[in-house]
Amino acid sequence: MSFLNNDFGSPPATSSPPTTMPKLPTIQDMLNNIGASTVNLMQPNPYLMQNQIPLPVPNLPLNPFLHLNPAISQEIIQQFIAMSFNTPNVLASIANMGDDEGPSCNPKMRRGDLLKSVSMDSTEDPPSITLDNNGDMIVPNNDKEGWCRNKKYIEQTENGYMCTVCRKVYGRYNSVSYHVTIYHRNPPIKCNVPNCQFTTREARYIHFHKNYRHGIPLPESIDQGSRKCPHCRHVSKSPAMLEKHIRRHQIKDGLSNINEAIRERTSTICDEAMEIEPAETEVDPIETKPRSCTL
């Protein structure tokens, strides 16, 4: 009995330590295996396709999002989300690219722009705007509009008042109204010397032109008598304004003549009515009884 002699047999063979450590799979290897298995699972099984009738398969466009590598899918999804958030801003910036250009960018409004703005703002027919020799626009002149005829050509801005015809800005309303009257309403003043094409907006420049170009001496004083109204004490600033003032007198005289004729006709009718004697009306007698008192 060998176990009594402490003989338990041959000792078990001891395993020698491994020479090399086993290689653990990395996360990239695991993701690659998952991607490969996903692709393999999507492949058709030949054993199941033997006894089946082939069906027509439509040619669908390749969708790259169905065959993504999981290692890069997260980054692509993040980029797609960022693009979806930025899409409204990009579209808004593209839509506003054409709105940056407008009439405010141009220092002067062209004739076509002025006609377009007038036709869009009002339902009336566009005014017949003409150009003079200096290229300034002449707006239609109508005395029936009254003293506020320049109001539709004046627009209030942050810096003052702007002429909508030539886009010039003045500090006061009276200044821009005078500008509209002189430069865009009254016709230009021409030089009366033969074969001279000089024109200007200011009457004083005509005298300077005649003195400098034609040697005509300047007048010693302003002849206010030629610009004085024969019907009242008014003195106009220019011959054109004097003609307008006299025309108003003629309109008033015509209205006064009409009113006088109406008054004469009314008084004649009243006199004819007074000459007619009123007809006598018969009054029936009213029977009266003496007062009676009953007790």
Swiss-Prot record:
Family: Belongs to the krueppel C2H2-type zinc-finger protein family.
Organism: Caenorhabditis elegans
Subunit field text: Interacts with ceh-60.
Keywords of this entry: Activator, Chromosome, Cytoplasm, DNA-binding, Metal-binding, Nucleus, Repeat, Repressor, Transcription, Transcription regulation, Zinc, Zinc-finger
Annotated protein name in UniProt: Zinc finger transcription factor pqm-1
Chief place where the protein resides: nucleus
InterPro entries given in the database record: Znf_C2H2_sf, Znf_C2H2_type
GO molecular-function terms, A-Z: chromatin insulator sequence binding; zinc ion binding
Signals that turn on the gene: Induced by paraquat, a chemical causing production of reactive oxygen species (ROS).
Regions of compositional bias (Low complexity) in chain numbering: 10-22
GO cellular component: chromosome; cytoplasm; nucleus
Entry's localization field: Chromosome; Nucleus; Cytoplasm
